[in-house]
Amino acid sequence: MKMNRILLLLLTFSSAIHSPLHGESLVCQNALKDLSFLEHLLQVKYAPKTWKEQYLGWDLSKSSVFAEQKLRSEDNPSTSFCQQVIADFIGALSDFHAGVSFFAVESAYLPYSVQKSSDGRFYFVDVMTFSSDIRVGDELLEVDGQPVAEALATLYGTNHKGTLAEESAALRTLFSRMASLGHKVPSGRITLKVRRSSGSVKDVRAKWRYTPESVGDLATIAPSIKAPQLQKSMRGAFPKKESVFHQSSTLFYSPMVPHFWSEFRNHYATSGLKSGYNIGDTDGFFPVMGPVIWESDGIFHAYIFPLVDENGRSHNVGFIRIPTYGWQEMEDLDSIGTPPWEEFGKIITLFSEKTEALIIDQTNNPGGSVMYLYGLLSMLTDKPLDLPKHRMILTQDEVVDALDWLNLLENVDTNAEARIALGDNMEGYPIDLQAAEYLKSFAHQVLACWKNGDIELSTPIPLFGFEKIHPHPRVQYTKPICVLINEQDFSCADFFPAILKDNDRALVVGTRTAGAGGFVFNVQFPNRTGIKSCSLTGSLAVREHGDLIENVGVEPHIEIPFTANDIRYRGYSEYIQKVQKLVAQLINNDSVIILSEDGSF
């Protein structure tokens, strides 16, 4: 059936070459057809559609008409123009999971990282070049004559709400543009007005590190396209399906990451821009929080340090950074070495013996695998943790997946049989009969929803059937935990603090997470607008009391933004002192935080 649909699309594109509509160019014709496909995809499969209508005032029909009119506004549009229109069309959803990537290589960047302080100023926190008039700690005042806030406003999506996460996304794009994400890519020189720590103000001229486009524009080759000729002896051959097990393109096989992550990750690698401020960086940007008395030599940045409380007593505290839940993307990962979840377990076992509390840094985390997330969480509790449920958009795709799972697990009645069918673990989550029963329950719920017509934002269902995360059979950290979060925590990194907070298992501090609240599905389809992939949200996660994560994010128990001093001098001393004070309270007050009437501690 899928092959038939692909053939139909190919025939449609072929006929479009030779049958111009209303005098439109070939590029415009193709873009209009691709826009129509994406509109249908949103109508059928985009779970937050109703939520976006309520939250943003977004309307699919109006948005589609606007994009169509914009495509037709150019007499002979370039492919890049059409890509920007389509990127804006999906970008209007204000959804970190939803986006389009393109087959394009044009890009430009400046080797700087900028961070905003709690008083609204912008500071350079990393300079990734040896030849620059800009220094770490300089304040950024203007970009090509525009105040920074105005420059960022030009980079927001259509329906932005001005959240910290949206502002961080614009700030990330300020010095890094990629045509593969539908950006307009600058070249040449740019003027940055900066203020030194001495107070002096200076204009600095910087040159974009520019890579030109080398994928030829369809508009330039369209006149040369010839009608295909088939020889009579040619026969069609359909590829045989390699496996009887259905390979879904949606729920079970797509990582939960923001739409831009793949392109940015590739940009980090190819540009050589190694920085602790990069999303997913192993070490992160915090300095060590005290004298290190033990440190891991593996792929996790982890150590133990002594924390002295206000009474002069010393307590050993563990620190571990979780840079990503996409464990296969971890830096320095040895594919034939110890899996990350096993190394995490060894560290947590040591922390259980040697520490009185644990600090987990998951700032700037792009998300990843939900089962890996569950696996790590299973080691941080001795009691089951309740999980958010998901309201799903169901298609035949999920129905066939459900049938496959039931077929696989049909005769599983013991722990041993569960492990034979599924393995000893699923990306770190220990497998037993309970896990198999969860998966079977999920399959039955999907089939019941389909049978009852409950397919448009279904009754809330536990993702994969997992109603709870059960404690790991061997590794269980039971002491106080403090989790550090920020507005660049996406998807699984939204769920991690949500689960710990909703179960009263950890103190969550920092700033509100990004709010990418659902599972992700990716779609590739034949096209000549250069669309590589479209990523969309396939569910709406619902927390306890009916709270959503999408667009809302996860609010910390205690908000601790970065001050100007934290950022300017990169020591984050004021932030760290507050975290240390809170952790000392957790240790001394049996995990209870005492706040004064004004909310201070």
Curated annotation (Swiss-Prot):
One of its GO terms (cellular component) is outer membrane-bounded periplasmic space. GO terms for molecular function: endopeptidase activity; serine-type peptidase activity. One of its GO terms (biological process) is signal transduction. SMART domains: TSPc. Transmembrane segments: none annotated. Belongs to the chlamydial CPn_1016/CT_858/TC_0248 family. This is Uncharacterized protein TC_0248.
